[in-house]
């Protein structure tokens, strides 16, 4: 049975370590824990900022091409701040669309989602993309970026869609 790959991408206005981002950073662990306990959750790639990145998920530093344009919109664009200090991607695997929808719009994640404008640059792209993968297949960060770009450029297709 196929599984649903789900990728989110957002750009923080300030770096993770900046006080402005504290409200978001303080919620990360709780939101990840609630995802891992959610019905239909299969697994997730660790962020590039965490030790023990599992290589089967691909290069955790992959980023959508259109993100470079958004870097200029951030307040903290000093040269000593790495671009990935602002990027907040997630990549996960779910049993079905209904499960990830329930996680995204109810509970801890929904609470954080309501405050996203406090922390993130308003995107000019879709904030997430979903696509089906064969059972046993692990989606990669690179594929996720390509799927988000496809959704951005062509709208929903069977290969890249939203809710």
Where are these regions (language model features)?
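Ligand-binding pocket scaffold of soluble enzyme catalytic domains
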Residues: 91-92
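Short S/T/G/P-rich N-terminal loop/turn motif that feeds into the first structured element of a domain
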Residues: 1-87, 99, 126-163
